[in-house]
Amino acid sequence: MLGLKLREEFSGRRIKGTMIEMHNRNGTGALDKSASEFLKITYPSIDMLKTVEAVQAGRAEPVVIIGARGQGKSHLMAALSHMHQDKDATVNWLNDWSARLKNPDIAGLKLQYGMHVITESLHLQRYKHVWDVLFDQHPHGNIIKAKWEVHGTEVPGYDLILEMAENKPFILILDEFQTWFEGLTNSNQYKRKTWAFNFIQILSEISEKHPELLTLVVSVREGNSDAAQQLFRVNPVRIDFKGPEAKRDRQRL
């Protein structure tokens, strides 16, 4: 037996839904738990292992996770967030599953420990712009925000975000990007969709050219959406929950 445990939302008499919350007021969200507690309910699926491999130290690449609601994208992203913040719990989890599955390659995975981790569920609409997430949650965010306001450009530029990453390298995990992006509109005065498009390109390019400074992980529902297509310009690693490998993996599980 693998010793897997159901997530709490599936163990009660009523199931509220399959989308997990990163944080909530009750302190029971995925990121409110300790890393060791959350990883106990995390199985090293093919999707999970491919994602961890893609963001490994020394070879990290931008990652786009594609899948419909309820397929496990948010759980994967929460696990990734925990892994980058708790090395001991992550190494123990990798070693444990390496032994259980008799797969030494799992124990050999090495993440970029020490990076600042920013994880945001964009569909909750806590921020108007993606750069507001960085200004609020990155240690150097306030300084970069002040510099940008002096520049007066519509979108924080490449050099400013690179400076932020050089001050403190970070991994940016954006869940439900497509849901958020499709809700944006352009007007004569506020071209929010265009601004979002331009800024995500800046993040993608920095993540591609300087993976040691910025690792970008984004989830979308559909690979043919406008939200996904703009991310595909830098040829990221695609984790497709609808793919045949993922389907076989779930059947085995």
Language model: regions and residue ranges:
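Conserved P-loop NTPase mechanochemical-coupling segment
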Residues: 27-33, 113-154, 176-190
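Residue-level preference for the first positions of well-ordered beta-strands
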Residues: 62-64, 117, 169-171
